[in-house]
A protein has these predicted regions:
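Bacterial Sec-dependent N-terminal signal peptides
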Residues: 1-25, 244-247
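Extended soluble regions of mature proteins
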Residues: 20-247
Length: 247
C-alpha cells in the first residue's frame, strides 16, 4: 500500500512544473439537513421525526463559496451568487471570511454567532491529517484522499486534494495538505463542499479582509472553547446547534 502511495505521489509531483499557482476556486456547499440531524444523538426521537416530516427525506440547502489562493496565502468567503434554494431569501449574509497567510504563518477570520461578530487572530496550527490510499477525479483534477477528526463538533471529515495544485489551502477551516483541497465530505455526506470550477486569476486585493471590521477579538483557543460551550448548551436543550454555527 505504501509503495502505491509513493508511486502516485511521484506521478503527481512530476506535474508540478506546470502546476497552477494562483487563482480562484468556486465551491458548492450542500447541507443535507435530514442526514445532519441523524448525526446528532442528543436530539430527541420526536425532534428528529418532526424535522424529517417538515423537511422531507432529501431536504438540502446549497450555497456557493469562493477561495482565492496563491503561494503566499488564501482567502475563503461567501459568493454573491444565489442558489435556487435561496432565490426568495433577501436577508443579508453574515460576515464570514477566513484568511491564511502562509508567509507569516497567521490566521485571520471573521464570523458571526448568535448575533455577534468575532475576529479570530492566531498562528496557523498543524492539523492531524491522515493521507489514505485512494484517488478520484474532482473537477478534472486527480485527487488523493485524506481524513481528519473534529473532536469538538464530533465530525469525521474526508478531504480530496489535488497535488497538481501544490497550494496548502482549502475551504472552510481546513488546510495543511500537500495540495489544494477540492472536496470535503463531512460525516458521511451530511455536508459536501465540492469544487466545481477553478479559474486562473491574478491575485491583487482579493485576499484582503474587509477594512474597519468591528467585533470581539479572540484567539484560536478561545474560539474552540466558545464553540464547545455553545454545543454543550444546545445538547442540554436537545436542540441542533448547527442552525447557528457552521457544521
Amino acid at each position: 500500500m505504501k509503495n502505491t502511495i509513493i508511486l502516485i505521489l511521484i506521478c503527481l509531483i512530476s506535474l508540478k512544473t506546470h502546476a497552477q499557482q494562483e487563482g480562484m476556486v468556486r465551491y458548492t456547499r450542500t447541507t443535507y439537513w435530514t442526514k445532519l440531524n441523524e448525526t446528532l444523538p442528543y436530539l430527541s426521537k420526536q425532534e428528529k421525526e418532526k424535522q424529517t416530516y417538515i423537511f422531507g427525506g432529501l431536504f438540502e440547502w446549497k450555497e456557493f463559496t469562493l477561495l482565492y489562493f496563491n503561494e503566499k496565502g488564501s482567502y475563503y468567503t461567501h459568493s454573491d451568487e444565489k442558489s435556487v434554494e435561496s432565490q426568495g431569501y433577501d436577508g443579508r449574509k453574515e460576515q464570514f471570511g477566513i484568511k491564511r497567510d502562509f508567509e507569516k504563518n497567521t490566521l485571520s477570520e471573521v464570523f458571526e454567532m448568535s448575533g455577534k461578530t468575532y475576529l479570530v487572530d492566531d498562528s496557523l496550527k498543524t492539523l492531524d491529517w491522515k493521507i489514505l490510499n485512494d484517488i478520484k477525479d474532482v473537477a478534472g483534477h486527480i485527487c488523493m484522499k485524506a481524513m481528519i477528526q473534529d473532536t469538538i463538533k464530533k465530525q469525521k471529515i474526508i478531504a480530496w486534494f489535488a497535488q497538481d495544485i501544490p497550494i496548502s489551502a482549502g475551504p472552510e477551516r481546513l488546510y495543511g495538505l500537500p495540495g489544494l483541497i477540492m472536496e470535503l465530505n463531512i460525516n458521511d455526506g451530511a455536508v459536501i463542499v465540492e469544487a466545481t470550477k477553478i479559474e486562473p486569476l491574478k491575485i491583487t486585493t482579493q485576499m484582503d479582509l474587509p477594512k474597519k471590521l468591528k467585533g470581539k477579538r479572540i484567539n484560536e483557543l478561545a474560539y474552540r472553547d466558545m464553540i464547545r460551550r455553545y454545543i454543550q448548551e444546545k445538547i442540554k436543550e436537545e436542540q441542533n446547534p448547527f442552525w447557528s454555527i457552521r457544521y
